[in-house]
Amino acid sequence: DVYKRQLFIHTETSFYNTLSGNYHLIIYLIRNDVVSPQKMNDGTIDHHYHHHAVLSNNINGTWGTLVNDSAVVNGDVFYHDFSFELPDSSTDSTYEINNLSLVTYICERNNFNILQAIKTELGN
């Protein structure tokens, strides 16, 4: 809901192999482009530097949401729903909906291997 700044996220996590582990779903809110000062290698400051993929929030916490902490088999599907209030773009234009994306990934917490990741743009 763009007008209320409320973001509703529905995820479906499908496994295509039999695996054993401690799997977590992690969702980050990122700003695609932020123009802000940056100190350069030569010591000068570029006041209009374009920063890309700026981490802005962890939607479901640092370690995410537990998907499964035992064995999964080919065909297992896990569903999760989240809601998140987006920062107000009238006070910081970098939070305009067309500049926001979600990076979602599945991580095995014991060894921190990432099984799959996807970037979803929120605008357009």
Task: Label each region the model flagged.
Residues 1-124:
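Short, conserved sequence motifs used for protein processing/export or organelle targeting and
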